Amino acid sequence: MTQLAIGKPAPLGAHYDGQGVNFTLFSAHAERVELCVFDANGQEHRYDLPGHSGDIWHGYLPDARPGLRYGYRVHGPWQPAEGHRFNPAKLLIDPCARQIDGEFKDNPLLHAGHNEPDYRDNAAIAPKCVVVVDHYDWEDDAPPRTPWDSTIIYEAHVKGLTYLHPEIPVEIRGTYKALGHPVMINYLKQLGITALELLPVAQFASEPRLQRMGLSNYWGYNPVAMFALHPAYACSPETALDEFRDAIKALHKAGIEVILDIVLNHSAELDLDGPLFSLRGIDNRSYYWIREDGDYHNWTGCGNTLNLSHPAVVDYASACLRYWVETCHVDGFRFDLAAVMGRTPEFRQDAPLFTAIQNCPVLSQVKLIAEPWDIAPGGYQVGNFPPLFAEWNDHFRDAARRFWLHYDLPLGAFAGRFAASSDVFKRNGRLPSAAINLVTAHDGFTLRDCVCFNHKHNEANGEENRDGTNNNYSNNHGKEGLGGSLDLVERRRDSIHALLTTLLLSQGTPMLLAGDEHGHSQHGNNNAYCQDNQLTWLDWSQASSGLTAFTAALIHLRKRIPALVENRWWEEGDGNVRWLNRYAQPLSTDEWQNGPKQLQILLSDRFLIAINATLEVTEIVLPAGEWHAIPPFAGEDNPVITAVWQGPAHGLCVFQR
């Protein structure tokens, strides 16, 4: 049998050099590491990794080639109270594997044991890593590098976006290839999108609980191999990487950036009753935050929490991010439950991973977006991330919904959110673009459901409607569910228009949820993470062309307003913004706090947003000048208005002079 040479301790993972493959694995507490390779017949061959440099185990297998399937068996103590759960009976995934062969099924053999180790061998059914070689012609690809102040983000699911699109070839619908199809790219361009933000594409597993109910993890926030693409989105698993890069190259040629939603807060190994795939068996004590009793700190709600203050885990996370930028040319990341990135265990702006990103010449140059919270004490960190990061602005989401959907909200609070939440983000040299404004996202109601449902309807998730938030700030306008009278449909449409206008004409970086622009509904499910079906797939045949045109016109209008595309904070008297009451006078202190929901926002001294969010038709006295409504608010008859606008109940209009 071929003997392993010592090889090199870097880089981590399996790397083919034309003559053989170098294997490296981090484990600070292992006593022995076996490389297990599998031939075409599934026969396993084991080799002890002979190299041991610090905490890196390594070896070189001569004559090994791309396509080789492999895994690891890691020997060490079984001491649960100390956080050690080594079990060499279990084949483990390389954390840096770039392709996985096999499925992560619910099987007792894929568990290590809870209090006592399960010594049943699982190599016959365990997924295997695959050695890959990287040859790809990027041609003249270059990142668009869209400035933050010109960025319009579109959050989408790879499968859900295109699976039902009638103009995309059936054989590629729901895949990476479909993202780069001319029909999809033309649609995004016409809409005005500059950045496509994809829900997780790194390989993930469905939780055993979901599998037992006949469901699956649709969103992908359950990662198992952070360097490998999820194969279900590929036409062929063997060509997934090239399919993904082809799509990115096509999107870049159209000037559209690609941002990946990435999960660096927990793994698919879940809690101590969860499956054993990789990290738990390689070095549980190093990779996870461990309590004094040996259990996990569950700061994510997913059973475990990655210890991103450990130097080796910081190196692992940094290498993962660099891989996606350097190998796939992605333009940025949205970090799920990003407060975990700053835990030491207290949240710190100078936490090791933040520092590593800031000091990296690659990662410091891409777009970085934080979901700025986790579920632990002190986990809500909106506004507290380092200056390189933009952040999801849930203050904006809640304020926009409360203002337009008949909840109490003072004008001052609404104006503050409209002005990029300067009270939250104007610190440490940050600019207005740091506020990622959103009204909806993948988790929560869609925009249409916000105006059709007062309550969540998550029964299909199998948890008796207990899952998902109850704080939706939604309004069904008098009838629970879709459909209704013409008057009801029109009132809901007006609310959708108002929310979209607030989102797309406010200061900050807007993020639009895919499907909101044509009225997609999840029938009241506000936590559709396990619904891989018509509930979440966008039905393009039912798309509202009128709403799509309205959204595109708003985005086009946004790009014409200097106050919205100049990335600087609005100051009193700078000509960017004036806040006026219904009589075109500056608002008094009392009006800011107690006045009716009537407001005029004058932007760049030429564009006026007139708002009447009350339930009564109200005369709005416009500022001096000749005003005319502009698309998408202008009708065929668009007379010049010089004095008064008859503001319909729950309405708004945008004028230019």
Swiss-Prot record:
Organism from which the protein derives: Shigella boydii serotype 4 (strain Sb227)
- Extract the CDD domains matched here: AmyAc_Glg_debranch (cd11326), E_set_GDE_Isoamylase_N (cd02856)
Entries under NCBIfam families matching the protein: glgX_debranch (TIGR02100), PRK03705.1 (NF002983)
Entry's EC annotation: 3.2.1.196
EC supergroup of this enzyme: hydrolase
Which positions are catalytic residues? 336, 371
The catalysed reaction is:
Hydrolysis of (1->6)-alpha-D-glucosidic linkages to branches with degrees of polymerization of three or four glucose residues in limit dextrin
The alphabetized UniProt keywords are: Carbohydrate metabolism, Glycogen metabolism, Glycosidase, Hydrolase
Report what the protein is called: Glycogen debranching enzyme
Where along the chain is composition biased (Basic and acidic residues)? 458-467
| Gene Ontology biological-process entries | glycogen catabolic process
Q: Which GO terms describe its molecular function?
A: glycogen debranching enzyme activity; hydrolase activity, hydrolyzing O-glycosyl compounds
Q: Which gene encodes it?
A: glgX
Question: What lineage does UniProt assign to this protein's organism?
Answer: Bacteria, Pseudomonadati, Pseudomonadota, Gammaproteobacteria, Enterobacterales
Residue numbers spanned by region Disordered: 458-479
Q: Which InterPro entries match?
A: GlgX_C, GlgX_Isoamylase_N_E_set, Glyco_hydro_13_cat_dom, Glyco_hydro_13_N, Glyco_hydro_b, Glycogen_debranch_bac, Glycogen_debranch_GlgX, Glycoside_hydrolase_SF
Asked if the Swiss-Prot or TrEMBL record annotates the protein with the keyword Hydrolase, the reply is yes
